[in-house]
A protein has these predicted regions:
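Short linear capping/connector segments at secondary-structure termini
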Residues: 1, 29-30, 103-105
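Acidic, metal-coordinating catalytic segment for phosphate/diphosphate chemistry
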Residues: 1-13
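Charged linear interaction tracts used for macromolecular binding and regulation
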Residues: 12-13, 22-42, 46, 50, ...
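Generic preference for hydrophobic
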Residues: 14, 63-66
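A cytosolic small-molecule/anion-sensing beta-strand core signal
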Residues: 18
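Short hydrophobic alpha-helix segments
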Residues: 26, 67-70
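Unchanged
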Residues: 39-63, 71-127, 140-144
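Eukaryotic, compositionally biased intrinsically disordered regions
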Residues: 127-133
Length: 145
């Protein structure tokens, strides 16, 4: 294997909406997050987003467009010793239903003013708010650090 420079990890987060509410999953520690995770080797941002939603919520989705690319340490706590690029992706549900699994114990759709306790290392209130705005703006240009 070729050696090289240390590069950032990629993390995808799916923004899925229904009736002006965003889908969040409940983690084993009782906090809630947008669906997503590390981009696996041989996966693209798009395919990984679709895969993570299926694994964590049992839903089949289309990844529609990129909302933002965030440097994790600028937006989430606690800081990591390595760099992470978080990719927020707007998705549309095609089918499926939630089943509890090894990663998540529940799911629900929440309005911006009734969010449950968040897993702030994965997503912040501001990031979720950004997804609400991006969803409603047809000409959203995307945010990036």
């Amino acid at each position: 294997m070729r050696q090289g420079f240390q590069t950032p990890k990629l993390d995808t987060r799916a923004a899925i909406f229904k009736d002006n509410k965003i889908l969040l999953v409940e983690e084993n520690d009782g906090t809630w997050s947008m669906l997503g995770g590390w981009v696996d080797v041989m996966e693209t941002v798009k395919s990984n987003t679709v895969k993570e939603v299926k694994e964590e919520a049992g839903l089949d989705v289309d990844a529609v467009r990129v909302i933002a690319l965030h440097d994790r340490n600028l937006h989430n706590q606690p800081p990591y010793a390595y760099n992470v690029c978080k990719v927020f992706v707007l998705c549309k549900v095609k089918g499926g239903c939630f089943h509890p699994n090894i990663e998540t114990v529940g799911s629900g759709y929440f309005s911006l003013d009734e969010l449950p306790p968040l897993s702030v290392d994965k997503n912040s209130y501001q990031q979720i708010e950004m997804c609400f705005i991006a969803r409603s703006e047809k000409n959203w240009q995307g945010e990036f650090d």
